[in-house]
A protein has these predicted regions:
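Flexible, solvent-exposed loop/hinge segments and secondary-structure transition points
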Residues: 17-208
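Short, Lys/Arg-enriched N-terminal segments with co-localized hydrophobic residues
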Residues: 1-15
Length: 208
């Protein structure tokens, strides 16, 4: 018997066969290269959407907490018995001053900031009476180096400025020396106090 030779594939059949042979390889490449990218993009989109929802949900809470903390700081330097209902917001534009309030009897508190160590802000709440005397201070130096710059937030440091007249600015050494090893933080507190004094003199004292 004569052995039949294999039938030669026509051109169209040959191309189809080659394409069929390549299909598994292309599918494998897609799974190995493209599919992970698609999955990663989908995950990123889902995470972004969840973060947006979370931010929308927490933003009002954060804002409320910030307002509560600021209110507590204002009240902490005012006479005992002062309440939130006694405070009136003051619109201020003095550089580095972030807020101010006054009371019906003429007391005022100015919130100011200054860059301390590594550029981190120190926040000061300075209370003034009707004569312009600095009656109380509160200093948030929690952003400064613990045990060094953070000491500027202790009353043993800033308490020396209580009783100072707003008729002149304060400076290191007059009446309080800088804390050893924390000159930058000490200067930040002084700068913030002086900003508060400027605000009081220019935007609160004598203004109805």
């Amino acid at each position: 018997w004569a052995t039949k030779s294999p039938r030669k594939l026509r051109k169209g059949e040959r191309i189809m066969a080659e394409n069929n042979a390549k299909a598994p390889e292309q599918e494998s490449n897609f799974k190995a290269l493209v599919l992970p990218v698609i999955v990663l993009v989908v995950i990123c989109l889902v995470c972004s959407a969840l973060l947006a929802v979370l931010n929308d949900a927490t933003a009002p809470i954060i804002e409320a907490n910030t307002k509560a903390e600021t209110l507590a700081a204002y009240l902490s330097v005012l006479p005992e018995g002062t309440t939130a209902d006694d405070l009136q917001d003051v619109t201020v534009t003095t550089a580095n001053v972030t807020g101010a309030v006054k009371t019906a009897d003429g007391m005022a508190v100015v919130q100011s900031t200054a860059a301390g160590y590594s550029g981190n802000l120190v926040t000061v709440y300075a209370a003034f009476d009707t004569t312009g005397t600095l009656t109380a201070l509160s200093v948030d130096a929690s952003t400064q180096t613990t045990g060094i710059g953070s000491k500027t937030g202790e009353e043993s440091f800033y308490g020396g400025y209580v009783g100072w007249s707003a008729s002149q600015q304060v400076e290191l050494g007059n009446p309080v020396d800088a804390i050893g090893g924390a000159t930058i933080s000490s200067r930040a507190v002084v700068s913030a106090i002086n900003s508060a004094i400027d605000c009081y003199n220019n935007e609160i004292a004598g203004v109805a």
